[in-house]
Each structure stands twice: as structure tokens, then as C-alpha cells.
């Protein structure tokens, strides 16, 4: 029973209302044994206008199946002593669980951001450089014009006008605020810019100076903001395991730690984009 209770607490705290992870298409119902089976849909059919030749030549559609194991996220256990639990004026175990939920959420968010940001520039996955003036750190600032360029790329790719999301990095949020504070404040009020719903988070994805996504965890390259169409990205939650383990003989208290299975990624290499800070 404790296992189910603590798993429910972790899950309830994992998707706060302000999190951009809520924008991803939930595929929880497709998870089985901590794996998810997806199909990448084949090419769209050709449309012929005012056809005069019958019958039309049929074409086959080839779909590709993908079996995807969910990533495993483990928190290192926290030791709560019997004395601490008795002498604190709050439920220390519940506080520790909330802390583990926040840590899991942060790590899963970083993984999701890295998976969603495209590897390099293409018509279906635009990766654009910033074009503003030197922001003082040797990089060009993000401008509102850059966001309009991204909008045009999405429009030319015929992506839906609804369900577009952009996740700004802190540097790019600062750039927009400096360029036009009143306009920025209006964006934060409406939550929209250039047709994109706006979020801001320190997601850590970085690119090279030529626009190639760098390895996960890179910290010395170019920061970026990334964007996506909601219908083109997914998230899936698997099992959440963990409960307080009483360890009286050696720890005089409890150990709390959790394991969560989760993945977030694009359905296909389409409908995702990034804007990276270009060298000035």
C-alpha cells in the first residue's frame, strides 16, 4: 500500500501546471512492461487534380515499427533518522518524497528537451542562428525577427497553426526583454509569441557554432531555444517504484529512494526546431 501511495505522490507532483512537459502528447496508455510500441507512418498519398486517366495507379504505404524501452531514472536514497522524524514539526518523509519528485522531474525534463531538439537543420527540422547584436558574451542576441523567421519555416512546412510551442532558454528570454520590455511583458501576459505558446526553462541543450546539436550534458557550447508542434512529440510514463525502507539496525531510521521509467521524444523527425546563439 505504501508503494502505491508514494508512487501517486510522485506522479501528482511530476506535471505541474506551468510545465512544458504538459504540452507533449501523452502515450501512457501505450506503455506495456515499460516499453512502448510505435509506428512511424509512411509517405502521404499523392493527390491528382482533374484526373482523366483511370484507374489511378495504386501505391503502397510502408510503416516502420519501433519498440522503445522507457529510460530509467533513479534517485539516490535519502536517510531520514528516527530522531529527525520525531523532532520535526512537519512530515519529513513527505517532504523528502516531494524533493525526490522535483529531482526526477528536472532530470526527465533535461532528457526530454535533448530528445526533442533536432540534430541539425533541415526543411522539416529548422535549426536557425540568432541574428541580433552582440549580447555582451560574444554571441548574437535572439530577436523578435528570429521568432518570425521560425514561424515562417513552420508555415512553409505546412505545420498546424495551433499547438505550436517554444521553450526559451534563460539567455534568449533576457534578449527579448532587453530588446523591447513592453513587448516582452505582453508576451508573458498572453503566453504567446509569433503563434507559439511560450515557456522558459534552463533545459541545457546546446549546439555547435555551425548548428549541430552537441552531446547530452555539454556545457561549453551554444545555448538554444527549441520549438515543436504538440502533435509531433510524445511523453510516456511507466512504473514508479519506491517506498520508505526501515533500516533500524544500521541506520536507525528509513531510507527513501525512487525509480521511475519515462521517455519523451518526437514521433518522427518532423515538426521540431531550434534557435541557437550564433557567435557575434
Regions found by a protein language model. Give the residues of each.
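Short helix/loop capping segments that flank catalytic or ligand/cofactor-binding pockets
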Residues: 46-49, 88, 175-178, 265-267
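A structured, mid-to-C-terminal "fold-capping" secondary-structure block
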Residues: 223-255, 259
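Short, conserved beta-strand segments within well-ordered enzyme catalytic domains
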Residues: 37-39, 69, 77, 167
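N-terminal "assembly arms/tails" that initiate or stabilize quaternary assembly
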Residues: 1-66, 272, 276-278
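Extended, compositionally biased alpha-helical segments that mediate assembly or anchoring
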Residues: 244-280
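Alpha-helical scaffold segments that mediate packing/assembly in large oligomeric complexes
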Residues: 83-156, 274-280
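Extended oligomerization regions of viral-like shell subunits
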Residues: 32, 36-37, 148, 152-238
Amino acid at each position: 500500500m505504501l508503494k502505491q501511495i508514494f508512487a501517486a505522490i510522485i506522479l501528482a507532483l511530476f506535471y505541474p501546471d506551468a510545465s512544458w512537459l504538459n504540452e507533449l502528447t501523452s502515450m501512457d496508455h501505450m506503455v506495456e512492461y515499460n516499453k512502448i510500441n510505435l509506428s512511424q507512418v509512411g509517405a502521404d498519398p499523392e493527390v491528382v487534380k482533374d484526373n482523366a486517366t483511370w484507374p489511378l495507379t495504386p501505391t503502397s504505404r510502408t510503416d516502420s515499427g519501433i519498440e522503445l524501452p522507457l529510460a530509467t531514472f533513479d534517485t539516490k536514497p535519502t536517510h531520514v533518522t528516527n530522531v529527525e522524524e520525531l523532532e520535526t514539526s512537519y512530515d519529513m518523509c513527505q517532504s523528502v518524497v516531494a524533493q525526490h519528485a522535483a529531482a526526477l522531474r528536472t532530470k526527465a525534463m533535461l532528457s526530454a528537451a535533448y530528445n526533442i531538439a533536432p540534430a541539425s537543420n533541415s526543411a522539416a527540422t529548422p535549426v536557425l542562428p540568432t541574428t541580433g547584436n552582440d549580447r555582451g558574451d560574444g554571441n548574437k542576441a535572439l530577436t523578435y525577427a528570429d521568432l518570425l523567421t521560425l514561424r515562417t519555416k513552420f508555415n512553409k512546412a505546412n505545420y498546424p497553426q495551433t499547438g505550436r510551442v517554444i521553450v526559451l532558454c534563460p539567455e534568449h528570454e533576457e534578449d527579448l526583454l532587453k530588446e523591447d520590455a513592453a513587448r516582452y511583458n505582453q508576451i508573458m501576459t498572453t503566453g504567446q509569441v509569433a503563434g507559439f505558446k511560450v515557456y522558459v526553462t534552463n533545459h541545457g541543450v546546446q549546439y555547435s557554432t555551425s548548428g549541430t546539436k552537441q552531446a547530452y550534458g555539454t556545457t561549453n557550447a551554444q545555448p538554444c531555444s527549441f520549438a515543436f508542434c504538440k502533435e509531433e512529440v510524445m511523453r510516456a510514463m511507466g512504473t514508479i517504484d519506491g517506498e520508505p525502507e526501515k533500516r533500524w539496525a544500521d541506520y536507525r531510521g528509513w531510507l527513501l529512494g525512487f525509480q521511475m521509467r519515462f521517455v519523451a521524444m518526437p514521433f518522427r523527425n518532423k515538426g521540431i526546431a531550434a534557435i541557437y546563439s550564433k557567435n557575434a
